[in-house]
Amino acid sequence: MAKVESFTLDHTKVKAPYVRLITVEEGPKGDKIANYDLRLVQPNENAIPTAGLHTIEHLLAGLLRDRLDGVIDCSPFGCRTGFHLITWGEHSTTDVAKALKSSLEEIAYHTEWEDVQGTTIESCGNYRDHSLFSAKEWSKTILDQGISDQPFERHVVE
């Protein structure tokens, strides 16, 4: 079975919240795709409940695209501690951390239910499992801790 980088990471050594560049893959024509670890809570110490994580996911899908060029996808980890962000091309972890911080600020302090995309039976595969209240509270908690552009030491972005 192929080795998966995420499963070789020592989850006891990282210091969340942080942004980490996992890999940059190059396609046969030179196209580059970057994969980032957007870790919002400390692994094995906490996990974001599914309804809040689901709402954060739907909001980040649009908010990160507004702040970073080339966003392909932002999908939650099964462990519920953060997200994979996939982009065309490579951004610095500082730029990604700043975009994440700005997006979480928008969620925490400015987002209303009407702003959440994909919350109907037609547009979401689990439309009943959302909580804007939880998304806002978790966003505030994460922002209070600061988002680092380094996974193993705290280097909080402004």
Curated annotation (Swiss-Prot):
Molecular function per GO: iron ion binding; S-ribosylhomocysteine lyase activity
GO biological process: quorum sensing
Record keyword Nucleotide-binding present: no
Reactions it catalyzes: S-(5-deoxy-D-ribos-5-yl)-L-homocysteine = (S)-4,5-dihydroxypentane-2,3-dione + L-homocysteine
Family matches, as SUPFAM superfamilies: LuxS/MPP-like metallohydrolase (SSF63411)
Record's keyword terms, sorted: Autoinducer synthesis, Iron, Lyase, Metal-binding, Quorum sensing
Top EC category: lyase
UniProt keyword Zinc-finger present: no
Cofactor dependence: Fe cation
UniProt cross-references to HAMAP family, sorted A to Z: LuxS
Family of this protein: Belongs to the LuxS family.
Role: Involved in the synthesis of autoinducer 2 (AI-2) which is secreted by bacteria and is used to communicate both the cell density and the metabolic potential of the environment. The regulation of gene expression in response to changes in cell density is called quorum sensing. Catalyzes the transformation of S-ribosylhomocysteine (RHC) to homocysteine (HC) and 4,5-dihydroxy-2,3-pentadione (DPD).
Subunit structure: Homodimer.
Descriptive protein name: S-ribosylhomocysteine lyase
Source species of the chain: Limosilactobacillus fermentum (strain NBRC 3956 / LMG 18251) (Lactobacillus fermentum)
Native organism taxonomy: Bacteria, Bacillati, Bacillota, Bacilli, Lactobacillales
